[in-house]
A protein has these predicted regions:
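Glycine-rich phosphate-binding loops at beta-strand->alpha-helix junctions
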Residues: 11, 59-65
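Short glycine-rich phosphate-binding loop at a beta-alpha junction
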Residues: 51-61, 80-83
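Short, aromatic/basic amphipathic alpha-helical patches
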Residues: 67-75
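Phosphate-binding/catalytic loop of phosphoryl-transfer enzymes
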Residues: 78-82, 88-162
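A mobile "lid/hinge" subdomain adjacent to the ATP/sugar-phosphate binding pocket shared
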Residues: 161-185
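Single conserved hydrophobic/aromatic residue that forms the stacking wall/gate
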Residues: 186-193
Length: 193
């Protein structure tokens, strides 16, 4: 089975695939202080009972990627591994001024979007994470660029800190996209939009 690891600034998402079928997935907090051994203890507990045939990793957190490399070399050295990072050939042309600045997550998203949806025309990929990424993919599967903005949680936190009459609210999906004239539900509507 193929274990995929997507290390984001806030969460790490792991998926276990049998060919193209997702068998299991997990979402865990990303902690850049974790050591290779701590990562292995966590990953081993999740994949226990599954036979790994491959590993694919992308990370936007250099400290975690460094520890993942160590973990892989110590505990999974016999498993074929692909780490998406600048310089790795993915088949995605990066038509931007500095391709090395494009995060691995955005490259993988481009590849997936084109494979799944892009054969008939261009597409826009929206990734709601610590930052909200909007990326444009050409009909040929080329990464054309995009826009980055603060993610939902950061936006809500910033509003609570910078707007005198707004407070931090729990990020839950409200009943309606239109808030019910209370600032709490109006801020939560941000999640729905």
């Amino acid at each position: 089975m193929l274990l995929t690891v997507d290390v984001g600034n806030t969460n790490t998402v792991l998926g276990l695939f049998d060919k193209e079928r997702l068998v299991q997935s997990w979402r865990v907090k990303t902690d850049p202080r974790d050591t290779a051994d701590e990562l292995w203890l966590l990953y081993r507990s999740l994949i226990d009972g599954f036979e790994l045939t491959g590993l694919a990793v992308c990370s936007t957190v250099p400290a975690v990627l460094r520890e993942l490399r160590t973990m892989i070399s110590h505990y999974l050295s016999d498993i074929p591994t692909t780490i998406i990072e600048p310089g790795v050939k993915t088949g995605v042309p990066l038509l931007v001024d500095n391709p090395k600045e494009i995060g691995a997550d955005r490259i993988v998203n481009t590849l997936a979007a084109h494979s799944l949806y892009g054969k008939n025309g261009p597409c826009i990929v929206v990734d709601f994470g610590t930052s909200t990424n909007l990326d444009v993919v050409s009909p040929k599967g080329e990464f054309l660029g995009g826009a980055l903005a603060a993610g939902i949680e950061i936006s809500v936190d910033a509003l609570a800190q910078r707007a005198a009459q707004l407070r931090k609210v729990e990020l839950v999906v409200p009943r309606s996209v239109i808030g019910d004239r209370k600032s709490t539900s109006e801020l939560q509507s941000h999640v729905r939009i």
